[in-house]
């Protein structure tokens, strides 16, 4: 936790690095209850109209508040705000060397210790939830559910040191480090939720995973397997169709296009299947319109989205928080970029948590899904 809030949006994957550092906000906008959301979004829009830059996070549960039919599903005992956005004068661009220097200045070499690591569910509890998902799929309620649980742990030391250590092990294009007086958010997300440049919108959902091989030959085989596996392709295509529909709610008619399907991206520990979608935004679309149409990302709910979110609330029980929400920025011009907040740690005075999970479809296997999770 920190007295002076900051947001580091960290692309450590692009050669040379490409990060944005936001410090000393003029104002912090947050919402903890559904009744506060509308005013908070208006305050963000007003700040942008004044030439300020917005950066921070939207929690997964914000999506429940944006849809009247789902608001009653909001879980009690939430640890983080529904949204936390700082309004800043302008970000400081950093290359990789500059980012590492800033991290070092703020405690990257200090102590960071995790202990008492444990899952929120037992294997038996996961199996019960998995079977319930399969029943819903068999009944025709949904085609896919993204079922998640959490690691909880004790933490001692400097959150910046933990982020720096994780960053060294996993280079990603959509990382983030957020410091507030009440919590820290550390995200090593490889997944782009959406990017807006002028009226151009792009999204890159990620669905489908394979481990890296122990040898170059095994690694190539696993990458080829992921690219060709029918189950992985089917899961990916479901989410592509969902996001095409979501983008269509804010896009010019006929402008939504799939740029590529089933592209495999390679990271240090896994191969990931991604696809690309682009669209041209209608001129009358503002922040609220975009969030109501797109949030949360379909890759972390399942399809169809609204019914999937109802089932997630029933089976998971606990709030996801920042995990599977979105972290990013909005410029005064309206340009914006947000990640899907996967591979994300939240630290507060009570310790830390990290959500994990995966998509379940009709032919999923409980043993395999538990092992992957």
Question: What do the PLM-derived regions correspond to, one by one?
Answer:
Residues 1-372:
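Extended alpha-helical targeting/anchoring segments
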């Amino acid at each position: 936790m920190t007295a002076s809030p900051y947001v580091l949006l960290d692309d450590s994957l692009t050669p040379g690095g490409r990060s944005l550092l936001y410090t000393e906000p003029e104002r912090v906008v947050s919402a903890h209850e559904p009744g506060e959301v509308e005013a908070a979004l208006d305050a963000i829009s007003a700040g942008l109209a004044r030439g300020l830059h917005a950066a921070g996070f939207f929690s997964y549960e914000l999506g429940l508040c944006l849809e009247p039919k789902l608001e009653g599903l909001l879980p009690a005992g939430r640890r983080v705000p529904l949204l936390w956005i700082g309004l800043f004068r302008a970000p400081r661009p950093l290359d990789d060397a500059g980012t590492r220097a800033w991290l070092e200045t703020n405690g990257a070499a200090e102590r960071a210790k995790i202990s008492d690591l444990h899952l929120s569910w037992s294997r038996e509890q996961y199996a019960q939830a998995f079977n319930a998902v399969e029943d819903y799929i068999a009944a025709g309620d949904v085609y896919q559910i993204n079922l998640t649980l959490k690691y909880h742990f004790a933490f001692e030391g400097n959150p910046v040191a933990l982020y720096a250590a994780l960053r060294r092990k996993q280079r990603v294009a959509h990382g983030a480090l957020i410091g507030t007086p009440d919590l820290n958010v550390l995200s090593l997300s490889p997944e782009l939720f959406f990017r807006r440049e002028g009226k151009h919108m792009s999204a890159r959902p990620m669905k489908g995973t394979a481990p890296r091989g122990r040898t170059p030959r095994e690694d190539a085989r696993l990458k080829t397997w992921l690219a060709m596996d029918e189950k992985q392709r089917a899961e990916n295509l479901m989410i592509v169709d969902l996001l095409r529909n979501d983008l269509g709610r804010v896009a010019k008619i006929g402008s939504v296009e799939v740029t590529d399907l089933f592209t495999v991206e390679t990271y240090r520990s896994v191969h990931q299947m991604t696809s690309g979608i682009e669209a041209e935004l209608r001129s009358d679309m503002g922040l609220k319109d975009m969030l109501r149409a797109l949030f949360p990302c379909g890759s972390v709910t399942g399809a169809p989205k609204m019914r999937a979110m109802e089932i997630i609330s029933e089976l998971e029980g606990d709030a996801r928080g920042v995990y599977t929400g979105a972290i990013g920025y909005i410029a005064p011009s309206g340009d914006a970029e947000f990640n899907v907040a996967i591979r994300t740690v939240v630290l507060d005075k009570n310790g830390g948590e990290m959500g994990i999970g995966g998509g379940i479809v009709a032919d999923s296997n409980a043993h395999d899904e538990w092992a992957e999770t």
